[in-house]
Amino acid sequence: MSWLRSSPLRQSGNGGGGGVSTGHSSTGSLRQRPIDAATDCDPRACYDSFCKHWQQAYDIIQHYAPPTHDDVLGVVSHLDYMVTLLLVELHHCNKVSLPSTDASAAPAAPCLEYLLSENLLDKLYEWACTTGRYANAVRLEQLKLYELLVSHSRHQLLCHEPFLRPLLKILASSQGEIFPPDLEKRLVILLNQLCVVLMQNVHLLDLFFFSAQTQVQEQIQNGNVPPPKSGTTTNFIIFSLLIPYVHREGSLGHQARDALLLCMALSQKNSNIGTYIAQYSSICPLLVTGLGGLYSRLPNSIEISSIDWHRITPDDVTEIPELTLFMNALEFCNAVVQVAHEMIKQQLLDFMYQGFIVPVLGPAVLQTLKGKHFQTNIDSQISAMSYLDLILRSITEPGLLRAFVKFLLDTEKFDGERILDSLVERLNSPDANLCMVTMALFDTLLGLHCEDLMLELLLKFMLPGKHVPISHRHKINKIDPYLNSSDFFLELSPDVLKRARDLARPKSVHEQQAPSGATGEQPIQPLAWPSLPSPVMSKTIGANWNYYGLHTGDSLYANLQAYLFEAHWRIAQCQRDCLKWANSYRYQKWPRHGQARVHAHALELARQFFSEFGGGPPAIASESAGEKQLDSLQSIGESSGYESFKWRPADEESDATDLTVTTTTASEADLEHNSSSVSSGMGGGGGAAAGRRGEVWRISHTNRNELLLTDLDFSEDLFAQGTVSLGPFLNAIWGKLQTFTSNSLYVNLHLTGLITRLAWYPLPLIHSLLLRSDIAITSDTPSFHQVLRILKQQIDAELPVTEDSLEIIDVARSSLIDREFRLVNARKGNENSPLHHHQQPQTTLSQQQQQQQGQQRSAYATLSAATPVQATQTSAYDPFKRSDNKRKSISKSISSMFSRRSTPNPPSSAASSGLSQIYAFFTGAASTLVGNNNNNSGSGGQSQPFSSTGTGTCETSLSTNPQSGAAAARSTGTATTANGNSSNSNISIGGSTQTLSGHSNTTTYSSSTLHGLDGGPQTGSFNSEPASLDSVASMGIIASTSGTERTRDVALCAVLLDEWLKELAAIAQEQSVVLVTDQLL
């Protein structure tokens, strides 16, 4: 314990802590302790010395005159010696020794026996009450003595009345008093130790709960202490003394909150304590009002220093003192709800909702004041939503999470306006920062796997099934289309990316023997899922593809095995959480036997429809099994659904399913299907979920009888196609997706991550929208697959398969991989600060020093000076080797732009052909760089880094929670957020350790700091590339290369879309595996 190490009682050469008073610290030198606690001494001599010191102190105590300064100093000095002797004795008593057979042997602790038998502590307390202005100094020494005895004797002394009675007296007299800081610290430490002892010995709890009441009444009768200010004699004195320190800063507040949590945990074991805290203490209102006050102190606008900032990270919390205090209070409330008695928990949740969430957090998110909207800027909206996102990511207790879910869906507290609807509207914001923060918040909400939230966002618009034509509804539970969907997503890859893969993939023996002319007439189609892994090469190091873990570089880019691993893990996690839902939203088969009334009702509805609109009943039985009678109405999808009116043959009946909502209760689902999953349509585990307090917030309590729908409302299905709405949430997401090529890179990263998170849900209804390309969608907006087709056509039109397009794609791909490495280096810098935190001075180094530092670079060094390489299949080149003079530039057209130099510049010649050219190519800085080369000759003949004139904007990680392989593999990734419970880790896939780029502790680095992480030289060359492409573009360099800004943006979108399609293909395949597994169980 830190307090014991720093205690003056353990230091033989120092005076007592605090002396008699703060004004007499110079007298501490008079109180030298000649022996240490661990010193071997004669027990008899120690006992004699102890009695002698007490006798001398008692002589001073017996003086009738008011104590003087010398009297108090003398008593304190003797008391200090007595404490030291007690330490020596307790040290020897705690040693393991054989029991003595001598009946006449002395007691094991004679000094302690004397202390208790003579009531020394009681006498000392009575004298301390008469010391007047020296009362605090004497009280401090008393607290030190009790602290020492409690820590060394554990619970044994608490059973002795000579020890317990004066302890209770001094605690009772401390109520309502204001003490100096040193005395407060000792008091909180003593209370903390008492809570630890009581937690380990619950049978002693009644001593402090009831004996305290008796002692207070006794002291009131004797006139020693005034009546307690609380107005009640029922008192848990330890808890009452800790309450004033609950919102204190620093170590004092932490120790007080730890002790209060122990008291809350004690309430679970003793119902009297729980009743007292809930009914007689003010802890719950105090916590909630303090939380609201701390929230009001938070900054109204957060300074955004990076271009891709989207949420508050733990580093941001530590850098903002007000936010640190607020998070400490919030985490304490979360812990109280977790460990406290049910009465305390419910009271705190009620106060939280009525006293903080609704009146404080609600207006802040809605930007309202007294019910009226006030003019605010974007920064205040961003900060309010960031705080809400941080709160949702920080709390873990189901009770609190359920309160926040209720807050998002409440329509009564905010004049009919729901918080969730306002958040959905902000998805359409033209401001990129607000849009990214909003999508990050929805990523957190979807990561909660809450049934009510999913019902309000998606499912209630999809449950009627109007978005799926009748003729396609029987396909929902089929398995094969999932595999076809994987091929569908891979085929949607832009043509220029397909061509790049064709050029990069080694040719087979058959292709090498084919004539050269046949190659151009019949291009090779890329394999969707290669049967055998093979190393794939391209003209740049950024195009080194990683199939199933076999890769030539350290990037996780295009690692299909990582995508499959990520999809499998995320789907399994989501499935486990959704198993606890009260209902399963699935397509349920019509029963084959029984329920003839249901069949008769369906046929009757069909006859009524045709008699009204068709003039007669349909000839259902007369049609042959192989014919399909089509309706004459205009069909928006593949069919109008007319053929679905007839009963399907037996071979189709097994797969034919119609949309209903399973309203089976949790207990029925648990009895009938114990091991089934949500993907197979079972709400299993409901009985366990009902008994698990920790998952109730995920379960919806909506009346499911209101959701019963009639699947055979044919007239509405046939005549309302094309007008079905998927809800404002999906409409906003689809709207952002339609402007994919116009969005910023970071908006697209969050957008793809949000859709990917939806695809993880094991719900066939969502799969019909996202993963099932064979199911037509009839809605008022283009379907997801239609939007993907439009994006492919748009990219193919703007990036035709030409040599220039392939070069731009290579540059875009390399830049995204370089971004991945920068994120990895930033994370490694956080985790391994001794190796990466030092920022080297930006001085000119000799060529030999540069080579030595280049050899010390880690495998995750940035790719700023790397150049394209012509690699064969057996090439074993190192993509991170910086001193390879055989490397070529990207192309002759690009190298020609940098070929004109007024003076030779050997140190920077290698650097001028790597990603520095890529950055220049992206930002159109060719002419500017050429012009600047002559101007930089004064600085050692090296050009100045971009970052010296650029902004301080740099990139941070897209996630505050750890991600699995594919999220880092895409680097361009999905902005996914895990449950807060996972930790940063490395996942070994395909025999290689893959460091994940998503992390929670993200530090923003400048360009020079990134190179300091790599251990590379800090020279004024192109090795000091800017932190991001956007920061280079922000310098205002006018584009002068062959590629326009629009072309470069489309190239980035094409590479991002290509990687995202691979991830969706992996998810579709893994979902099919889950569905097969569930059906076999």
UniProtKB/Swiss-Prot annotation:
Compositional bias per record (Polar residues), positions renumbered to this chain: 1-11, 857-876, 954-963, 994-1010
Compositionally biased residues, Low complexity: 657-668, 840-856, 891-913, 933-953, 964-993
Residue numbers spanned by region Disordered: 1-31, 504-524, 650-685, 830-913, 933-1027
Pfam families: DUF5917, KELAA, RAI16-like
UniProt KW Metal-binding keyword: no
InterPro entries for this protein: FHIP, FHIP_C, FHIP_KELAA_motif
UniProt KW keywords: Phosphoprotein
Sequence positions bearing Phosphoserine: 508, 833
Source superkingdom: Eukaryota
Family (UniProt): Belongs to the FHIP family.
Name the record gives this protein: FHIP family protein GA25918
Species this chain originates from: Drosophila pseudoobscura pseudoobscura
